[in-house]
Amino acid sequence: MLSPAIITLPWRPDAAEHYFAPLSALPWAMLLHSGFADHPHNRFDILVAAPRATLLTRGEQTWVDDGETVVVSAEDPLQLLQQQLDRQPFTPQPHDDLPFLGGALGLFGYDLGRRFERLPSHAQADIALADMAVGIYDWALIVDHQRQQISLLSYDDPQQRLQWLEAQTPTPGETFALTSAWQSNMSRQQYGEKFRQVQAYLHSGDCYQVNLAQRFQASYVGDEWQAFRQLNTVNRAPFSAFIRLDEGAILSLSPERFIQLRQGEIQTRPIKGTLPRLDSPPEDAQQAEKLANSPKDRAENLMIVDLMRNDIGRVAVPGSVRVPELFVVEPFPAVHHLVSTITARLSMTLHASDLLRAAFPGGSITGAPKVRAMEIIDELEPQRRNAWCGSIGYLSYCGNMDTSITIRTLTAWQGQLYCSAGGGIVADSEEAAEYQETFDKVNRILQQLEN
């Protein structure tokens, strides 16, 4: 049983940014950041780079590179990922204060779902980033904000890894700037037409809820890491992440957990229901109360809770699925969200990768029933979602997993920045309110980058 060697570094609250900045241009350098959030899930930042192996999925094929050979396979990507984890000689016991003990970390894009469900191909695939981009890492730097402790863990010599980290010199990147205004992929009129098409599907009994999104696009120059740091400081989202790949970067400021697995215990926290924050504290408190008591938002949230209970129930110990929290209002810098919590116990014979597959992509960003909602999304949204509404996270050698839903997430590719926003449409949704909600969710991000 091989466990990692661990050394403790002197405390500094910005350790993740300090050590990541010189690595930020390296392909496969990745940072999971708790966004300095005033939030119970803000505890850990996790930094990795220089993986032992990588897996890149595009469409039907996955490239598995173990550093010596590259194998191209048409097998299930999450099965290939599990095989890579099983191949490593590391079997650490879970550790309360170190959530990630090496293992797989990276991006699972929304369109990876096409490998698990049969979906049509109407939407244009215009961004050539991978559907899955995951590294297998044998070291990590973990910043624990609650205990104010920085741990460098490695299955090799952590002192050597520390020397490597400290020898990295930042290359001053070009200053980040947008070079065009944000443009949506649909006009107000087109959004209205798509909204009414969703309503027709809802009223004919095809589905109960569909998440409809618009995508904003702008051209830019400069260093994406600079943009992420600027956004991260202001948005303070507990599931933030920066991922550097060969062909682009992902900047995620997500408030939403998808699935956490800790020592066999499953937790998922779908967000459904949103209202903008208000400047006046009494009015803001009233706004939170309004969201908590909104029949429409509660109905939307309950549909997704039922969907997630069903998804998780496929791999959970029978009878273990519970809903300890229903309709809790959580404040974030720009919006209030309505959040519920579902828990369960993973069946003893299954892995984290089986749980991820069973629930992917998250129901909170598709609608219900999930597959029919995904078919309608593919028909009505002009382009594929790519990284947006997928997941970023880790599957640790110890069996633990934690993943986000990649909402409030930007994709940087070939000098273009893409940022999408959507909302769950139900039978009593109002078109103007749903359209406005897409702006409430990302205005803060879009405007920050314009300045």
Question: At which residue positions do the language-model features occur?
Answer:
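Extended alpha-helical targeting/anchoring segments
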Residues: M1-N451
